[in-house]
Swiss-Prot record:
One of its GO terms (cellular component) is cytoplasm. It is found in: Cytoplasm. Belongs to the AOR/FOR family. Its cofactor is [4Fe-4S] cluster; tungstopterin. Optimum temperature is 80 degrees Celsius for the oxidation of hexanal. Keywords: 4Fe-4S, Cytoplasm, Iron, Iron-sulfur, Metal-binding, Oxidoreductase, Tungsten. The lineage of its organism: Archaea, Methanobacteriati, Methanobacteriota, Thermococci, Thermococcales. It is an enzyme of class 1 (oxidoreductase). The gene is wor5. WOR-like catalytic subunit of an oxidoreductase that can desulfonate and oxidize aliphatic sulfonates such as taurine. The activity involves two steps: an oxidative desulfonation reaction, followed by the activation of a second water molecule and oxidation of the resulting aldehyde. May be involved in the oxidation of various aliphatic sulfonates and also phosphonates. Tungstopterin binds at residues 77, 93-94, 96, 195-196, 198-199, 353, 357-359, 470, 490, 494-496. This is Aliphatic sulfonate oxidoreductase, WOR-like subunit.
Length: 624
């Protein structure tokens, strides 16, 4: 076996037991790693009882996984997979963390975490030493405090144990903030103060297990690769291509804060009521001049250097620190809340990171609440204060209410979809039309109405990961621009921003590492399809509190059918009948039946005929 260690750690927090489990080459060939492998493990262990498994219950599994490209390809990501408390399906979430590299160097391809600890703990991994340790004194801490205490202590412990001279690279750590501890459904798993596995709500899953952090340090070599010379040749090509991404290196994704709204008319403004603006204050140049303290920051081994660090050195929010912010947070902590000033956006982004929340879903719920206040549906009495667009202090107050689950915050902590249902019930008025989500997951900060962005018509509507802008569907279903290719990147476990060499070349690189000899066509018609079909099945099984019906839920948010009210493409909006036709076309091409359910004969062809039992349960629930 090449590029893999061939084993996972299996950690039972309830029994306080740790063991190793083997991974067969056959399973790895079929599911690759990361998102694909995680989906398979969840299906095999929980598939027969999926609807009954509470994502925030002891029975759910939390998977931390690597892929075959981890440690070899430029940049560094780690995959987190579980049953999502947002969608009740499977979301493959990745974060910029060296944890995957450290695990691989310690001899593992990932970790299965099951059960629930009696009290707060953290997981410590140093090569073949694996310990479940008390974390009571760290519970309640945010990232900054954790780095000053827990990580510093463990770093010193390892340095002394190995008798290392100087200051060796610190261990990798992922952790949760108060949002995860209090099981806010859109809590993130954090690392390096400001990087997150946001989509999925896996910070809440980690919190439900009383797991504060996972720390790993490996000193062993990475697994051998199949063809080292070919790997080197391709790496040299890739480095040249990636190093040529000068605009990205210079400005990062934050360059989109102005251009996505002004040039593409697809940026969320005031809960997506608009998508065009011409406010230059949010220009990346203003962030550079007023907030940046570090212009080039990269994940381990990445030549792109797209990350920037903002720090407020003076003013009312002095001490706030954030990564630029990136485009998604500029939009969701900025324009979506009617805020365009860099300092205010940095402040709110800092709060989101310290509290351990997903910036996209947080900005989505804040914008939803603000629109309800704008329309008089939520009142000052409901909130305890006024919630006007552009008022960062009010949004900060609401953030704290959400994390502490106090007052209206208890409802909003359930996420936009569930909060919309509850508020509709309380107020006696349907507010779900103001909830901009797909299957419980907030859409990324890229609209579809203008058709000037990469997101189009059915990008979110039929994605197995709902509103996730990094896993969008497209026609043709088996083309190079849809969720099958994105499932490859998530299963290989690499960053979407280092895929410039292209799908075919990166597949070739994976083959040089693993020796699997996978073709692009094989991925699109077999391996990727197998992963997507299993994700689709688990999403439609859902439960225990929310279930999706593809006949009505394979659709865009109602807001996306409202004509754009301003900008160069004013009046533009998708046609509902056109969307329905494209959804049907997607079903046919991907291998679903006319109702959007994976066909049993396709499952047999993909070698997962066992999943027909789940399909039968879906059909029974939908009376089909």
């Amino acid at each position: 076996m090449y590029a893999y260690n061939g084993k996972l750690l299996d950690v039972d927090l309830t029994r306080e037991k740790v063991k190793e489990v083997e991974l067969s080459e056959d399973v790895l060939k079929k599911f690759y790693g990361g998102r694909g492998l995680g989906t398979y493990i969840l299906w095999k262990e929980l598939g027969e009882k999926w609807e009954k498994v509470d994502p925030l219950g002891e029975e759910n599994l939390l998977l931390i996984l690597t892929g075959p490209l981890t440690g070899y390809y430029p940049g560094m990501k780690t995959s987190i997979v579980s049953k999502s408390p947002e969608s009740n399906g499977v979301v493959g979430s990745v974060l910029s963390s060296e944890l995957g590299l450290e695990l691989k160097a310690a001899g593992y391809d990932g970790i299965i975490i099951r059960g629930k600890a009696k009290s707060p703990v953290y997981l410590f991994i140093h090569n073949d030493t694996v310990e479940i340790r008390d974390a009571t004194k760290y519970w309640g801490m945010g990232g900054i405090e954790l780095y000053k205490t827990l990580l510093k202590e463990v770093h010193e412990e390892i340095r002394k144990k190995e008798k290392l001279k100087g200051v060796p690279k610190e261990p990798a750590m992922i952790y949760i903030g108060k949002g995860g501890e209090n099981k806010v459904r859109f809590a993130a798993i954090m690392t390096k103060l400001m990087h997150a596995a946001g989509y999925g709500g896996y910070g809440a899953v980690m919190g439900s297990k009383n797991l504060k952090a996972v720390i790993a340090k490996g000193s062993g070599p990475l697994p051998e690769v199949y063809d080292k010379e070919k790997m080197k040749v391709l790496l040299r090509e890739f480095w040249k291509e990636l190093f040529s991404m000068t605009t990205f290196r210079e400005w990062g994704t934050g360059a989109g804060g102005y251009s996505v709204g002004h040039d593409r008319s697809s940026e969320p403004i005031r809960n997506w009521q608009e998508e065009y603006h011409d406010n230059e204050e949010i220009s990346v140049v203003n962030f550079e001049n007023r907030t940046w303290i570090k212009k080039y920051w990269a994940d381990y081994g990445c030549p792109v250097n797209c990350m920037k660090i903002s720090y407020l050195r003076y003013g009312p929010y002095k001490g706030s620190i954030s990564d630029a912010p990136d485009y998604e947070l500029q939009a969701y902590m900025g324009t979506n809340l009617g805020i365009f000033e860099p300092e205010k956006i940095v402040y709110l982004s800092y709060l989101v990171d310290e509290l351990g929340l997903d910036g996209i879903n947080t900005g989505n719920i804040l914008g939803f609440a603000a629109e309800l206040y704008q329309r008089g549906i939520l009142t000052k009495e409901d909130l305890g204060f006024e919630l006007n667009w552009g008022d960062e202090k009010a949004f900060a107050k609401l953030l704290h209410l959400i994390v502490e689950k106090e007052g209206i915050g208890k409802i909003l902590a359930e996420g936009t979809y569930r909060a919309a249902l509850k508020i509709s019930e309380i107020k006696g008025i349907d507010v779900t039309k103001y909830a901009v989500h797909v299957k419980g997951i907030a859409v990324g900060a890229h609209g579809i109405r203008s058709e000037l962005d990469y997101t189009k018509d059915i990008s979110y509507a039929v994605s197995v990961q709902g509103g996730d802008h990094t896993s969008t569907a497209a026609l043709p279903a088996k083309g190079y621009t849809g969720e099958l290719v994105e499932a490859f990147y998530d299963s290989a476990v690499i960053c979407n921003f280092v895929t410039k060499p292209g799908f075919e070349k990166i597949i070739e690189f994976g083959n040089a590492l693993s020796g699997f000899n996978i073709t692009p066509e094989q991925w699109l018609n077999e391996i990727g399809l197998r992963i997507i079909h299993l994700q689709r099945i688990l999403l439609l099984l859902g439960g225990p509190d929310v279930y999706w019906d593809p006949r009505k839920d394979d659709d865009n948010p109602p807001r996306f059918y409202e004509p754009l009210p301003s900008g160069p493409v004013k009046g533009k909006a998708p046609n509902r009948e056109d969307i329905k036709a494209k959804v049907k076309q997607y079903y046919e091409e991907i291998g679903y039946d006319e109702h959007g359910i994976p066909k049993e004969e396709v499952l047999e062809e993909l070698g997962i005929g066992e999943a027909k039992r789940e399909v039968k349960r879906i059909k029974k629930r939908l009376n089909l």
